[in-house]
């Protein structure tokens, strides 16, 4: 048997590549790179030769020696790139492999090569400065967060052009004489005989529509006399202090004569459009008058039977038509009759409300229709309860007690039903009553508005004269009774 070799570094393996291997064109590397990496596994065992198997069994496993003149070996833990992956680390009992075992169980996750990798790229030489612009940057910036050049420039304010020539009728300006002359050559005259207006063709069309179209008022201001007359008319209507005082005096004189009414101004006023009607229904605090009337009626019911005989409140308004108030006022024969109760049906539709308001609207004045005292079923039932709870005056009490028990049972059933209905209404947030639409003026009424005003003023003057002169002698009788 051969003597074992001393425990020294063996000679470096021959790095000259064999012909035909991929490492032919590999450039020479530094020696420290090889020492920083783990050595490759030993080559596979060939078929045993006679006499060699016994010598291998006797020789221990020795590490190869570094080449002469090479640097001392580095620890593998110093260079993190040279460390094997976690799945390639040897188990704790792997140290016995260095003490004489023949086969290693070490398997690397990536193959190790002394030269180039199989794909032709050198290992551990990747460049980290790629000139590619990343796609996750916004388009308004570079990779270095720089704004583009066109955004850095501030927008300059444009200077207003300076015009030296003007056309007053067309309201246009021109920079030189040539453009002004070409524009003046395009002027045309108004096609009307008495009109001397001349301007551009489009402006002449607007002028004809506003001044000479059928139905338009013709204003002639050609002569200085017409201009002076037009100015005087404008000055009369201008609201100076003298004109205001003059108007006040005229109004006082008309009031003394009895001409109180004025011509109704028709058009898109408050209360005429559909949107204002919907706003009144939606906002109960500002415009909803049905609820205020209902609250007043509830207070009247709580007072007792004497409140039922009292007159309904008449809204006091300064601008109410006097003739309309006379028409709506009750006559003496109506006062003698008993007041009838008006009960609203269970299902009140908007069509029914509009029909009721149209029947109640008699006057053609601009005053609002007078509200009729409407009582709900709950209020009528409450009144019935008050009437039944009062002590009876007739001697036949047995008959009344039986009728009272029947009526009380009916009243309790109706009250339970009304409670359910009120709960449903509270949940649905629906108003119990719909406000009727205001009377929209007809075309004939709008055309005859001045004549209607004049006739009513004449009637009011007659009424005023009768009262002032005591035509029927009513004041004399009252004076005589006072003296007696």
From Swiss-Prot:
<dbReference type="GO" id="GO:0005726">
    <property type="term" value="C:perichromatin fibrils"/>
</dbReference>
<dbReference type="GO" id="GO:0001650">
    <property type="term" value="C:fibrillar center"/>
</dbReference>
<dbReference type="GO" id="GO:0070761">
    <property type="term" value="C:pre-snoRNP complex"/>
</dbReference>
<feature type="modified residue" description="Phosphoserine">
    <location>
        <position position="329"/>
    </location>
</feature>
<dbReference type="Pfam" id="PF10453">
    <property type="entry name" value="NUFIP1"/>
</dbReference>
<keyword id="KW-0479">Metal-binding</keyword>
<keyword id="KW-0597">Phosphoprotein</keyword>
<feature type="region of interest" description="Disordered">
    <location>
        <begin position="43"/>
        <end position="77"/>
    </location>
</feature>
<dbReference type="GO" id="GO:0005730">
    <property type="term" value="C:nucleolus"/>
</dbReference>
<dbReference type="GO" id="GO:0000492">
    <property type="term" value="P:box C/D snoRNP assembly"/>
</dbReference>
<feature type="region of interest" description="Disordered">
    <location>
        <begin position="269"/>
        <end position="294"/>
    </location>
</feature>
<feature type="short sequence motif" description="Bipartite nuclear localization signal">
    <location>
        <begin position="234"/>
        <end position="250"/>
    </location>
</feature>
<dbReference type="GO" id="GO:0045202">
    <property type="term" value="C:synapse"/>
</dbReference>
<dbReference type="GO" id="GO:0008270">
    <property type="term" value="F:zinc ion binding"/>
</dbReference>
<dbReference type="GO" id="GO:0005634">
    <property type="term" value="C:nucleus"/>
</dbReference>
<feature type="compositionally biased region" description="Polar residues">
    <location>
        <begin position="395"/>
        <end position="408"/>
    </location>
</feature>
<dbReference type="GO" id="GO:0016363">
    <property type="term" value="C:nuclear matrix"/>
</dbReference>
<dbReference type="GO" id="GO:0030515">
    <property type="term" value="F:snoRNA binding"/>
</dbReference>
<dbReference type="GO" id="GO:0030674">
    <property type="term" value="F:protein-macromolecule adaptor activity"/>
</dbReference>
<dbReference type="GO" id="GO:0048786">
    <property type="term" value="C:presynaptic active zone"/>
</dbReference>
<keyword id="KW-0539">Nucleus</keyword>
<feature type="compositionally biased region" description="Basic residues">
    <location>
        <begin position="283"/>
        <end position="294"/>
    </location>
</feature>
<comment type="function">
    <text>Binds RNA.</text>
</comment>
<dbReference type="GO" id="GO:0045944">
    <property type="term" value="P:positive regulation of transcription by RNA polymerase II"/>
</dbReference>
<feature type="modified residue" description="Phosphoserine">
    <location>
        <position position="331"/>
    </location>
</feature>
<keyword id="KW-0862">Zinc</keyword>
<feature type="zinc finger region" description="C2H2-type">
    <location>
        <begin position="165"/>
        <end position="187"/>
    </location>
</feature>
<keyword id="KW-0863">Zinc-finger</keyword>
<protein>
    <recommendedName>
        <fullName>FMR1-interacting protein NUFIP1</fullName>
    </recommendedName>
</protein>
<comment type="subunit">
    <text>Interacts with FMR1. Interacts with ZNHIT3. Interacts with NOP2, NOP56 and RUVBL1.</text>
</comment>
<feature type="region of interest" description="Disordered">
    <location>
        <begin position="1"/>
        <end position="28"/>
    </location>
</feature>
<dbReference type="InterPro" id="IPR019496">
    <property type="entry name" value="NUFIP1_cons_dom"/>
</dbReference>
<dbReference type="InterPro" id="IPR039136">
    <property type="entry name" value="NUFIP1-like"/>
</dbReference>
<keyword id="KW-0694">RNA-binding</keyword>
<feature type="modified residue" description="Phosphoserine">
    <location>
        <position position="333"/>
    </location>
</feature>
<dbReference type="InterPro" id="IPR013087">
    <property type="entry name" value="Znf_C2H2_type"/>
</dbReference>
<dbReference type="GO" id="GO:0042802">
    <property type="term" value="F:identical protein binding"/>
</dbReference>
<dbReference type="GO" id="GO:0008023">
    <property type="term" value="C:transcription elongation factor complex"/>
</dbReference>
<dbReference type="GO" id="GO:0003723">
    <property type="term" value="F:RNA binding"/>
</dbReference>
<dbReference type="GO" id="GO:0051117">
    <property type="term" value="F:ATPase binding"/>
</dbReference>
<feature type="region of interest" description="Disordered">
    <location>
        <begin position="386"/>
        <end position="415"/>
    </location>
</feature>
<feature type="modified residue" description="Phosphoserine">
    <location>
        <position position="394"/>
    </location>
</feature>
